Amino acid sequence: MKRTSLLIALVLTAFSVSAQDIQLPAPQKNAEMTLYQALQNRASNRSFSSAPISDQILSDLLWAAEGINREDGRLTAPTAMNTQEIRLYVCREDGAYEYIAKENKLLKVSGKDLRADVAGSQAGVANAPLFLVISCDLNRYSRKNDHSRVMGAVDVGYVSQNICLACVALGLSTVPRAGMNQEVLRKELGLAEDHLLLINHPVGYKK
């Protein structure tokens, strides 16, 4: 009886966690703005309205940042030797999620609102509807050394630029930032020391 109850509890727990994952709608790739218009209009912004960002807009943004754009699983952002070592997290009021590009879904990793922790010392940006946090998983490299750290930092930069330009095309605002409470984020996102937390983006509509 006790064993049966334990199995039922485990199943219910697993279902509860998976039920909190979010299947995103298919990204729409028909933005009217040209690349050169996006480059012309790109600007950093740190003041955001409280207007929510729909799952459709979020899906479009995440695909542009680091989505799959070829049948062989390669991404919109290049990575050294196609290592695909970049991890992208969405932090918003209802918790924190990892973007799973292959399934176009958000995998819930924390139920806490971590936006203030991502904002760090710049509390003024903490009111953004969401933050995108970009990390580099050094375990994807055959060797973890200074060279792999440099390559990882460069690859994070590609994703950051994609986010900047996609935000313009989608009518959103953002700013790339390095400051954040790394200790809290590592704990809540489940990241070890060999995951580099390098850049985050508050994202929202301009106030």
What are the language-model segments listed below?
Residues 42, 61, 88, 130-141, ...:
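Small-aliphatic-rich amphipathic alpha-helix that forms the alpha element of a beta-alpha
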Residues 126-129, 194-196:
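Short coil/turn connectors at secondary-structure junctions
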Residues 27, 135-137, 204-206:
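Generic beta-structure capping elements
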Residues 14-16:
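N-terminal signal peptide c-region/cleavage motif recognized by signal peptidases
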Residues 10-11:
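Short, linear, compositionally biased motifs with a strong N-terminal bias
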Residues 190-207:
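A glycine-rich helix N-cap at a beta->alpha junction
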Residues 1-4:
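Positively charged n-region of N-terminal signal peptides that target proteins for export
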Residues 20-128:
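N-terminal amphipathic, basic helical "cap/leader" segment at the start of enzyme domains
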